[in-house]
C-alpha cells in the first residue's frame, strides 16, 4: 500500500453533551483534544446530539395526527373557505 494516504483510524471518545453520554468507537476524525478514560488517553470529540438524545431514537418525538395534511389544512383554514362573500 502507498504510505501517507490512509487516514489514521483509532479509538475515539465521543461525548453527547445534551445527554451527558460517552461513546468509545473507532473513527478517523481529527481532533487535538484528549480525555482520560479507563486509564487510557483517547482523542475527545463533543457532540450536540446523538442517538442518546435525538427525539427519534429516544421516543420523545412529536407525533402528527393520522388524518394527514389535507385534514389539518381544512381544520385550520376551513372557516375561511366556507364563508360566503357578502
Curated annotation (Swiss-Prot):
Cellular compartments per GO CC: ribonucleoprotein complex; ribosome
GO BP terms in the entry: translation
Keyword Ribosomal protein included in the entry's annotation: yes
One of the Pfam families matching this protein, by short name: Ribosomal_L31
Keyword Amino-acid biosynthesis applies: no
Source domain of life: Bacteria
Protein keywords: Ribonucleoprotein, Ribosomal protein
Sample GO molecular function, one term: structural constituent of ribosome
Family: Belongs to the bacterial ribosomal protein bL31 family. Type B subfamily.
NCBIfam families per the UniProt record, alphabetical: L31 (TIGR00105), PRK01678.1 (NF002462)
Subunit text: Part of the 50S ribosomal subunit.
Name used for this protein in its record: Large ribosomal subunit protein bL31B
